[in-house]
């Protein structure tokens, strides 16, 4: 259902408010770049520092801007099950195609708690639900057995697995089979992830280079493995730089270099260091995203 190249969309700000003009520009740039879907209000979209009203408005606006041209997988996760349920139901109401739910962060639920959380949200919506495991952010790791158990819930259809752990991905694929679509949440390991059963990526890099990541996907699916590896290697440097400081700090800087938005984040996020911005600029020039 959610296969291919999806962009973990940044949320542009101007003078501390959401910049809806820039958001429209970003959406068009992404669709023109060939992506299969957009993910507003995820980690890359600074969802943790959006108010609930802003969170809903961004989801609604992206759905309206897309007009069915690509899929919209709305970020609706929270560390509070009731809040996540509310956001998910709202995403369904305004026409999103699915909901992406990060594991509840900070309060560190057990595996039983994770199953209860996701099952509760899924039971309140008809939307397809995508799990999201990123323990480096949340301090809770969703085990393969937990994912396999949740695959039995009819509208829990996929997982964004952001650990970059191929063994984990293989365990999920073996245990859940076709009932759980595997989506990479780690740009640097997208290609090897495909080799163990992955069927897509939710990418940070596509904010800057959507066509290149789409090319990698197309080459892989056309059986052009060596050519796909060449694109993978072209992207290695920028994939690394986009996480050399806490994401989305670097990708916001890169988007500003492309003239897509202001280089503005919400505290406690601060702008990328000048030294790292220079490195990112050089990497973008190498990929012909920018001129010298």
Curated annotation (Swiss-Prot):
Record protein name field: 4-hydroxy-tetrahydrodipicolinate synthase
Stated role: Catalyzes the condensation of (S)-aspartate-beta-semialdehyde [(S)-ASA] and pyruvate to 4-hydroxy-tetrahydrodipicolinate (HTPA).
Places the protein is found: Cytoplasm
Binding-site list for pyruvate: 44, 202
UniProt source species: Magnetococcus marinus (strain ATCC BAA-1437 / JCM 17883 / MC-1)
GO biological process: diaminopimelate biosynthetic process; lysine biosynthetic process via diaminopimelate
EC numbers, comma separated: 4.3.3.7
Assembly behavior: Homotetramer; dimer of dimers.
Coiled coil residues, start to end: none
């Amino acid at each position: 259902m959610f296969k291919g190249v999806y962009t973990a969309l940044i949320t542009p700000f101007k003078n501390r408010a959401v910049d809806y003009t820039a958001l429209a520009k970003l959406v068009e740039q992404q669709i023109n770049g060939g992506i299969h879907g957009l993910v507003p209000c995820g980690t890359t979209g600074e969802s943790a520092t959006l108010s609930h009203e802003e969170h809903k408005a961004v989801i609604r606006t992206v759905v309206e801007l897309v007009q069915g041209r690509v899929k919209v997988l709305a970020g609706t996760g929270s560390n509070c099950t009731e809040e996540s349920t509310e956001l998910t139901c709202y995403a369904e109401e305004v026409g999103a195609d699915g909901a992406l739910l990060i594991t509840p962060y900070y309060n560190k639920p057990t595996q039983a708690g994770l199953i209860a959380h996701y099952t509760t949200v899924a039971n309140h919506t008809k939307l397809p639900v995508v799990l999201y495991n990123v323990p480096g952010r949340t301090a809770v790791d969703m085990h393969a057995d937990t994912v396999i158990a949740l695959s039995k819930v009819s509208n829990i259809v996929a997982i964004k697995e952001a650990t970059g752990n191929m063994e984990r991905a293989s365990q999920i694929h073996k245990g859940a089979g076709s009932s759980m679509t595997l989506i990479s949440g780690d740009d640097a390991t997208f290609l090897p992830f495909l080799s163990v059963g992955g069927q897509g990526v939710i990418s940070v890099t596509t904010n800057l280079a959507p066509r290149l990541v789409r090319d990698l996907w197309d080459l892989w699916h056309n059986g052009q493995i060596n050519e796909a590896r060449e694109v993978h290697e072209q992207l290695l440097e920028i994939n690394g730089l986009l996480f050399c400081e806490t994401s989305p700090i670097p990708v916001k800087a890169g988007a500003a270099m492309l003239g897509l938005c202001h280089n503005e984040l919400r505290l406690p996020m601060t702008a990328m260091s000048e030294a790292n911005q220079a490195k990112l600029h050089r990497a973008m020039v190498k990929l012909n995203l920018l001129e010298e």
